[in-house]
Amino acid sequence: PMLEPEYDITAADRAEGEKIMLEAIEEGLVALPEGQQVMLKLSIPKEAGLYGGLTNHPKVLRVVALSGGYSTDDACRELAKNPGMIASFSRGLLQDLRAAQDDAEFDATLSAAMDKIQAASVA
């Protein structure tokens, strides 16, 4: 299964709310049957590394970062501060693509976005 809990990145109490959400996720993981794993899709946390414990949890297959609310550059910069999280930035891949681009420009634009997002995922 994939779980996608989100906390509003513009909320005034974001840091506190993300910590409460993390505690709830950790409690849920304890309740999972042995041998079952989940994938988590989470907004990039305000506190760098907040979800680090989840990335190594035996019941977590992957922790995927959502870029919602951030520009691609900002999302990549924030993701790079969170080792173990990988990007799920579909908007970031597509935002600079245009129907009017010729094949070479389209391919170059897509490649540049992929390179930027991949680099942030392995930082």
What name fits each language-model region?
Residues 20-27, 49-53, 108, 112:
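Alpha-helical scaffolding segments of alpha/beta enzyme cores, especially the outer helices
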Residues 3, 90:
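Conserved, mostly hydrophobic/aromatic
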